[in-house]
A protein has these predicted regions:
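Non-catalytic, peripheral interaction segments enriched in hydrophobic/basic residues
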Residues: 1-131
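Long, internal protein-protein interaction and assembly surfaces
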Residues: 96, 137-141, 147-151
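Helix/loop segments that flank and initiate small ligand/metal-binding modules
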Residues: 153-243
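Residue-level preference for nonpolar/small residues embedded in alpha-helices
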Residues: 84, 142-147, 221
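Nuclease-adjacent, charged terminal/linker segments that flank catalytic cores
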Residues: 113-117, 122, 126-133, 147-157, ...
């Protein structure tokens, strides 16, 4: 479903609406079972919700749509039982979750590899070649949202310009694994910088230095006790721990 300007935003709004309802459904089911297990919840999210959010990511995956990530954050904050305005930096760090942009971008790069091997008689290959010839190297405002330009920009950003120049790599599986790790490392560094640059997080960073899921999320099985610790660590309780 595209708009008259060939935008995916209308379709994404529909997908994200369904995905958010699925998150609520998962939460209700787990409440009925009287459990809110960390591993189970996010396995269900990754298996049932994430595929809905990343539908057709091969095409739009290199564009960071906030509406997609908002559902991911909605699920994370509902699990932690914190307010919607809780800083996203704390949410990602506490759960050790990475933005879905990493997965969507990899889908686009994976599709780019597939396009390189298609014969020119195939319509997807013809569309790609036309887009590439018209836009790559002609980075005016009108061309910056081109799909091929986005692919090239991704390779350049993460230090793999040679892959674009060579129109591929020898071992695609190994490269995608390497690219994913590079994206993860860059995000970890960005997360750390945000944590250290803000006075608002001075208390949180005194006991949070590694980007990984906190052990108490699985060790504390009584939800009400876990929720108290979550709110205390994030400074969203009655005690003003950030001053």
């Amino acid at each position: 479903m595209l708009t008259t300007k060939l935008s995916f935003e209308l379709a994404l709004e529909e997908y994200t609406g369904r995905a958010k309802r699925k998150v609520v459904e998962i939460m209700k089911t787990m409440w009925k079972l009287e459990t809110l297990d960390f591993d189970i919840f996010f396995k269900l999210f990754d298996a049932q919700v994430k595929p809905m959010l990343l539908y057709a990511a091969e095409i739009w995956g290199l564009t960071r749509f906030q509406v997609i990530e908002s559902v991911h954050l909605f699920a994370c904050k509902r699990f932690l039982k914190v307010a919607p305005q809780t800083p996203n930096t704390l949410i990602y760090g506490e759960l050790g979750r990475f933005p879905l942009y990493i997965d969507s971008a990899l889908s686009s790069i994976r599709y780019w590899f597939k396009l390189q091997k298609l014969l020119l008689v195939r319509l997807p290959k013809q569309a790609y070649v036309m887009d590439k010839n018209n836009n790559v190297g002609n980075l005016t405002v009108a061309h910056t949202h081109s799909w091929s330009v986005s692919v090239k920009r991704c390779f350049d950003l993460f230090g793999f310009s040679n892959v674009w120049l060579n129109s591929g790599v020898g071992n695609e599986k190994a490269f995608l694994k390497l690219l994913k790790q590079r994206m993860i490392d860059c995000y970890r560094q960005d997360w750390s910088n945000k944590l250290n640059d803000s006075d608002r997080f001075c208390t949180y960073r005194s006991f949070k230095c590694l980007f990984e899921p906190e052990r108490y999320l699985t060790d504390i099985t009584i939800v009400k006790f876990r929720n108290v610790l979550v709110r205390f660590r994030m400074g969203v309780n009655e005690l003003n721990v950030n001053n």
